[in-house]
Amino acid sequence: MQTRQLLALALAVAATEAAHQGFNYGNTKSDGSAKSQSDFAAEFSTAKNLVGTSGFTSARLYTMIQGGTSATPISAIPAAIAEDTSLLLGIWASGGNVANEIAALKAAIAQYGADFGKHVVGISVGSEDLYRNSVDGVKSKAGLGANPDDLVSYIHQVREAIAGTSLSGAPIGHVDTWTAWVNGSNSAVIDACDWLGFDGYPYFQNTMPNSISDAKALFDESVAKTQAVAKGKEVWITETGWPVSGKTENLAVANTANAKAYWDQVGCPLFGNTNTWWYILQDADPVTPNPSFGIVGSTLSTTPLFDLSCSAVSSSSAVPSATAAATAASGAGASGSQTSGFATAAAGSSSAAKPTFSVGKGPNGSYNGTYPGSWNSTRPGANGGSSGSSGSSGSSGSSGSSGSSGSGASGHSSSTGSSSFPSSTNLLSNSASGLSGSLFGAVAAVFVALAAL
């Protein structure tokens, strides 16, 4: 009887431990017009029923604020509740609007209560604010950023806002580029977070070999470097993708064949194993941007522009191993050398044209430095160096002024597979290879319990 109960428990725990998979959703369309609740509902329904997939049932938001308003809660919330879509909430942390963001968060909690709480998988305080605040971000005119100390303060404010509410158990993190994460002067943000969000686009790494055949290696390397400084905290993949159309970036060609290859090589190993929010379901309504990353075209449809099935794709190497993360740490300036600016960014790199569309900007048109938003390919997140480069730290800690030079990245390896049984997580962390939100930890824990009978 004990065995049956434990197996039942395994299934129950596995169900709760399944990694979230979804897309990023801005509060406006590509022409800057605000999305309505029905717009969000249609997108969420489409994502759940995409042909060739098991369904993308999670949504990452950039802001808590409805487009065109100052502090009204975003209408994606009631749409998500109606469509049973989980939410990675976003607090826009640049430009001095945090008070309104938190006000909208509190209003949403009061309005939607327990239904809201059970759909929230996490809260991201900020999106690439550290990159935008770096020397390279300022050079690229990526928009307003935020200092590490400010982000830490905002994280604490959000914790206070959700204490004792239906969202009290929501893990809080921050989303940024890997070069921001490995910059030692930003380590206080890592300390304040429950998880780290990773944004990366090999397509834009145009100062190095970045053909589609290079893409997975570039992606894995940058994730490993992020894991190496994460201090054992989970690294969630909050943005990545490959464009279906648009200009060529060095060796990176935007077309559906390459978008499919990137989906197979990078996406499929992640889906179901690591919390992942892909960029993007649709970005061509009503205007098609250059480049365009949408997996559906200008008309919302459950039939994608390319085959999304992963059945024939290996699920191995969902995230880089702990060994790879440790190696990345040693090659990313872990010795503690200090430099001014990102030493891993290619000197004199050429900049690409900035996209003109607005999907994914902050509330009411403020820039999001990650693609989408104000983009320049000289950004360190696009042009970081390969393994073995020295001195990954030292971006400015203030908006392009006299900011401090940070120390090199510390060589922490990350063990991110979580489960309801901490002892099994520790025992099996090497085998799990750091799979964030994986079924592995839950099932393995039950087998450990069975072995002890």
From Swiss-Prot:
Compositional bias of kind Low complexity: 389-402, 410-423
Protein name: Probable glucan endo-1,3-beta-glucosidase eglC
UniProt-annotated stretches for the region Disordered: 370-423
Lipid-modified sites (GPI-anchor amidated asparagine): 430
Natural source organism: Aspergillus clavatus (strain ATCC 1007 / CBS 513.65 / DSM 816 / NCTC 3887 / NRRL 1 / QM 1276 / 107)
Post-translational modification: The GPI-anchor is attached to the protein in the endoplasmic reticulum and serves to target the protein to the cell surface. There, the glucosamine-inositol phospholipid moiety is cleaved off and the GPI-modified mannoprotein is covalently attached via its lipidless GPI glycan remnant to the 1,6-beta-glucan of the outer cell wall layer.
Xref: SUPFAM superfamilies: (Trans)glycosidases
Family assignment from sequence similarity: Belongs to the glycosyl hydrolase 17 family.
PANTHER family named among the record's database cross-references: GLUCAN 1,3-BETA-GLUCOSIDASE (PTHR16631), GLUCAN ENDO-1,3-BETA-GLUCOSIDASE EGLC-RELATED (PTHR16631:SF13)
Keyword terms, alphabetized: Carbohydrate metabolism, Cell membrane, Cell wall, Cell wall biogenesis/degradation, Glycoprotein, GPI-anchor, Hydrolase, Lipoprotein, Membrane, Polysaccharide degradation, Secreted, Signal
Span of the signal peptide: 1-18
Cited InterPro entries: Beta-glucan_modifiers (IPR050732), Glyco_hydro_17 (IPR000490), Glycoside_hydrolase_SF (IPR017853)
Any one Gene Ontology BP term: cell wall organization
Taxonomic lineage: Eukaryota, Fungi, Dikarya, Ascomycota, Pezizomycotina
MF-aspect GO terms: glucan endo-1,3-beta-D-glucosidase activity
Reaction catalysis annotation: Hydrolysis of (1->3)-beta-D-glucosidic linkages in (1->3)-beta-D-glucans
Coiled coil: none
Gene3D superfamilies registered for this protein in UniProt: Glycosidases
Secreted keyword on record: yes
